[in-house]
């Protein structure tokens, strides 16, 4: 069973790399960040690359 992993700051850099690593391991991810457009772009890219995982996005500033 896949785990659901929450990642803050997922729109670039380390956060984006961590999200990709978890998806490669078969986990689902919850992406959060301030840049709404970038979150939606990543969601689309990840859905195409990892069709068996679920990606949720929530714009927020921690």
Describe these PLM feature segments.
Residues 2:
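Phosphate-coordination loops involved in phosphoryl transfer and adenosine-cofactor binding
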Residues 49-62:
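Rossmann-fold cofactor-recognition segment
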Residues 22:
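Aromatic pocket-lining residues of Rossmann-like dinucleotide-binding sites
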Residues 25-42:
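Conserved glycine-rich Rossmann-like NAD(P)H-binding loop of the short-chain dehydrogenase/reductase
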Residues 15-16:
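N-terminal Rossmann-fold NAD(P) dinucleotide-binding loop
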């Amino acid at each position: 069973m896949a785990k659901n992993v929450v990642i803050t700051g997922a729109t670039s850099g380390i956060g984006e790399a961590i999200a990709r690593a978890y998806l490669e391991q078969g986990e689902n991810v919850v992406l959060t960040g301030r840049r709404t457009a970038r979150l939606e772009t990543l969601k689309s890219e990840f859905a195409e690359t990892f069709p068996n995982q679920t990606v949720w996005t929530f714009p927020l500033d921690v």
